[in-house]
Amino acid sequence: MESNDNQKTSGLTGQKLVIVESPTKARTISRFLGNDFQVLASMGHVRDLPDRRISVDPEDEFKAIYQITPTAKPVVNAIKAAAKNAPEIYLATDPDREGEAIAWHLLEAAEIKKPVQRVVFHSITENAVDEAFAHPREIDMRLVNAQFARRHIDRLIGYPTSNLLRRYVQKGSSAGRVQSPALRMVVEREEEIR
């Protein structure tokens, strides 16, 4: 976990908690917000589908099994500890479906039960951060579910197809929801040129 001046006061009652993805953003945003806020970095995704298993059940409403990644355990523990004493919690992960899903996974992994607010900014400037904190919102579950769908399709289609390619075509081969259609487009274009 990246350290900054506000993190040294971790656990002080009354300090609002802000969670961003990167340590660099944490340092910059911490300067903008001041000592009333503790800004921590999640370092990106904190949970994922386990390796070596599909971990998504299409027969049970696509229920997925997520686990905290080994590298994220200390980060999750630090966030969990900071959240206990924070009067307010703001999730300021990136403004896209991945960031929205990271925010949701942070709540689940750190077992945060108190209300949280989602703040979104598209640039790391004092004005943009102030504007975001003036207009907090809830986590957008439509974006979270869009990321889940993308991740689940990767696992349900790309994972077994890649295994077959490696077994029967060439070691190191892979397939996926983006690269397979892109490869088809390249092949079709090559055929047109010929």
Predicted regions and their residues:
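Long, charge-dense, solvent-exposed interaction surfaces that engage phosphate-rich ligands
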Residues: 153, 177-178
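C-terminal helical "lid" subdomain and adjoining coupling/linker elements of P-loop NTPases
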Residues: 164, 168-175, 186-194
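Short, hydrophobic/aliphatic alpha-helical segments
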Residues: 84, 158-169
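Intrinsically disordered, low-complexity regulatory segments
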Residues: 1-151, 160, 181
